[in-house]
């Protein structure tokens, strides 16, 4: 165990340094003319994530250091046999591990803010609210760790406070979701594969968030704690949101990274297959958990057999589909058409250069073209060669 603790301690430094790198890069390397509220919303999400990495990871490092000292020296810190308190370890662990959830979900939300506006061809609704909600989520993530410990023996007052704070997290999350939906309202929606992933994200994230309300409610959590309901909720938030956003981002930026277009129709079909198989896997687990099926049991009551079979079937279908998605992307490296500079009609900086970008992204020593962020009126689709371009040469200002 000691080598594992030492390894995790060292890995924590990589997270801290990465966060510092992101914060400094955003502060110091924005192009001339790009103020804070001219940044892409993806950068706001990355910035909020980096703040969590810098502030939360040291707590994990100190916890591992205390655990290391306890093991080596024999001082009672967490081990009750030595006079320690295991609940203290839970507090330290969850103080890091709940913000760590937002390290995964905030970049996913940032990706959604990009995909939805690009494929709706409409200015993002409530830019400043989405930006501030990212910072709000980062700050609130440090205040709700105790909802993981409702049944661990902490005081009733602490349970009540953490329950109330847990519900407050819904505010910045809902701000994002409703602004995304408002962006889609009466928009010119293009159902390309990245947009399919984005729409899936909104629905799955909504289910994950709404089921979290039950777990944040004290008396309900006593029944649902450590059941399959928690397993399903976690996967709707982490896999149904973070992983879905990852695949949406992968399909969105793949042409820019590789210079190749993948097969679009199979990509759409496989995205829909993931949606079907994901829900087949995890919806039955909500029912099982509500009916008392505990997690981490290798066996189960016969009345849960059908739902376990459905869940297993969905998992197998999803696994095969994810493999096919990967193959579709890899095949495009050899057989895919050459990607245009701006295949989706994006207005952020990466779409103002070639696919893939040259070294240093833009020619060294020349002004960086700074387009009007999330403005699509001057963009037209090239029906012959594919991709999008501006109507006028001066649509993007130079900075």
Question: For each of these PLM feature ranges, what is it?
Answer:
Residues 1-399:
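Membrane-embedded and interfacial regions of multi-pass energy-transducing membrane proteins
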